[in-house]
Amino acid sequence: MELRHFNQVQLSRRWCISPRTLERWRWLRQGPNYLKVGGRVVYRLDDIEEYERRHV
């Protein structure tokens, strides 16, 4: 089964970047779209793949 949502740590591992980089991007309104669910940040796979298509 494929993951449909990634948390910050999972996405940082996928992209080989620091979780702190994702935090900074959110603060700067950069990076992929994200959702806050119950106080947690999650990234939808569709948004991740769209960001990858536009920036890779």
Q: Which role fits each region the language model picked out?
A:
Residues 1-24, 54-55:
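Polyanion-binding surface elements
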Residues 7-9, 35, 49:
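Intrinsic disorder/low-complexity detector
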Residues 21-24, 33, 47:
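Residue-level recognition of specific faces of alpha-helices
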Residues 28:
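Alpha-helical DNA-recognition elements
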Residues 33-41:
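Short Lys/Arg-enriched helix C-cap and helix-to-coil transition segments
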Residues 47-56:
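A short, Lys/Arg-enriched interface patch at domain edges and termini
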